[in-house]
Amino acid sequence: MIPVLLVTICLAVFPFQGSSIILESGNINDYEIVYPKKVNVLPTGAMNSAHPCCDPVTCQPKQGEHCISGPCCRNCKFLNSGTICKRARGDNLHDYCTGISSDCPRNPYKGKYDPMKWPAAAKGSVLM
């Protein structure tokens, strides 16, 4: 029997449980949750209701889906490249989704050299 570590997001339905659990894979239909000196059996279908993007057994995105959560993930898909995921503040510029990740990478540019706002400024010039 190989224990499988499940990530908390798939089990958000069960707030009384710890930050992670181990699923004993002897009989996967029983969904046995193994704790030290204690075994609980979840009701049938309980794992399936946790998150619409998440495979209830592997806690990975379901087949055909890109992501489970994150600032650049909506309805189980990555947001388009160039979508603002963090608004500008002070001297910092907007941060944009890449279209290939659910993370929101930090924009390395400052001021008028933001390549999403001023693409002409970045063409053929050296940015310092």
Curated annotation (Swiss-Prot):
Keyword Signal (UniProt): yes
Q: Where is this motif: Cell attachment site?
A: 89-91
> What domain of life is recorded for the organism?
Eukaryota
Q: Please tell me in which tissues this protein is expressed.
A: Expressed by the venom gland.
Cellular component per GO?
extracellular region
Q: Where in the sequence is the signal peptide annotated?
A: 1-20
Record bears the keyword Cytoplasm: no
Disulfide linkages recorded for this protein, renumbered to the chain, are C53-C76, C67-C73, C72-C97, C85-C104
Which residues are removed as the propeptide when the protein matures?
21-47, 115-128
> Domain Disintegrin, which positions?
26-112
Q: Tell me which UniProt keywords the record has, alphabetically.
A: Cell adhesion impairing toxin, Disulfide bond, Hemostasis impairing toxin, Platelet aggregation inhibiting toxin, Secreted, Signal, Toxin
Location comes to:
Secreted
Q: Cite the GO molecular-function annotations of the record.
A: toxin activity
Q: Which family does it belong to?
A: Belongs to the disintegrin family. Dimeric disintegrin subfamily.
Annotated function: Poor inhibitor of platelet aggregation. The disintegrin inhibits the adhesion of cells expressing the RGD-dependent integrin alpha-5/beta-1 (ITGA5/ITGB1) to immobilized fibronectin. Inhibition on alpha-2b/beta-3 (ITGA2B/ITGB3) is low.
Q: How does it assemble?
A: Heterodimer with EO5B; disulfide-linked.
**Other comments on record:** Negative results: does not inhibit alpha-1/beta-1 (ITGA1/ITGB1), alpha-2/beta-1 (ITGA2/ITGB1) and alpha-6/beta-1 (ITGA6/ITGB1) integrins.
- Name under which the protein is recorded: Disintegrin EO4A
Protein's organism:
Echis ocellatus
Lineage of producing organism: Eukaryota, Metazoa, Chordata, Craniata, Vertebrata
